[in-house]
Swiss-Prot record:
Protein name in the entry: Putative F-box/kelch-repeat protein At3g16880
Ranges of the Kelch repeats in the UniProt entry: 98-149, 155-205
Claim: Protein biosynthesis is one of the keywords in the record: no
Keywords for the protein's UniProt record, in alphabetical order: Kelch repeat, Repeat
Keyword Transcription regulation: no
NCBIfam families according to UniProt: F_box_assoc_1
Positions of the F-box domain: 1-47
Organism: Arabidopsis thaliana
Amino acid sequence: MTKMSKLPNDLLEEILSRSPLYSMRAIRLTCKKWNTLAKEESFTKKQLVQTKAAKEFMVIMMMDSKFCLMNINLNKEEDVEPSIKCNGKIINPIGMCRVYHCGGLVCITKSFSNTRDVVWNPYLGQTRWIKPRSHHAYIYAIGYETKKSCRSYKILSSEHNYINIDDERVDYEIYELDSNSWRALDVNSNWATAFYKMDVSVKGNSYTYTDYRGDFLISFDFTTERFGPTLPLPFHSRCGDIVALSSVREEKLAVLLHRCNISRMEIWITNKIEPNNVSWGKLFLTVDMKPLIIDDGIFFIDEEKKVVVVFDKDKEMRNRITAYIIGENGYFRKVDLGDSESFPVRCSYVPSSVEIKQLAKGKSN
């Protein structure tokens, strides 16, 4: 019998790429050869193909101070129920409560009075702790610009300074992972209150919904390091409506609208999205559904299967989190995720082999 260590690389890659994502740390630690193989772009692509073939996609969620990598199986066959599997705690989240994802990297941070943030690649198991220049800085987004076919990752933060009750100044800074350094950003923005909402990254840039002084999207371009013009939504919301954003495999933007006075949820997906331009497709899905309890509107989309997963507090037992899996022609399933006193914090996750450069011991920003 041929030993695994003696197998040719192409066959070994084919076998190991079929392993679930949460097994990758054990695979990388097995030997130096496997660790090198797991970092290859071809290996990552094969694993993504296997994940898609298994009719699953991945999300990262924090429930009751535990970050979990969840596999969501959206099989719509009549004899196979959809499932959501939590693969256990994957990072120490003490004091962390906000999650941002872009291009395979995840930034986890506190909301306010921040002392440290962490950038993390769950696929490679790499992390870097980042110390903000101010304890009152607030992480707004993570994104990247492309330089000579390579991605240069950056983090945008803001610090809100209240001069008086009617006057607020917002200072912005950019952190570059490549240089491990912060620098001041000379930009102006009138959308300070919007930054308390969760942003969504698409193609390396950031998008946030705001109902402050209007009803639209705000973009930040990580290449020009500038805010773009306001971008229209495919609807006009009213006071009390729930509006939420999600990305579709980081290639498209999706928006959810749940009217406060009627039991109907509507979802649209972009045809085109850029920091300076957006084009919305026709209505993607309409569902008759009772109003959501969690006003963040946590949802994910599988565009190919035309299925939406919405996370919310259970309507009858408010201490439990429920995933509602919704599709066309009245398709509706519920998956109980268990007890959670806090609202879940989440982001979708697409694996990437992008490495986080490790700093020399004792070196910090």
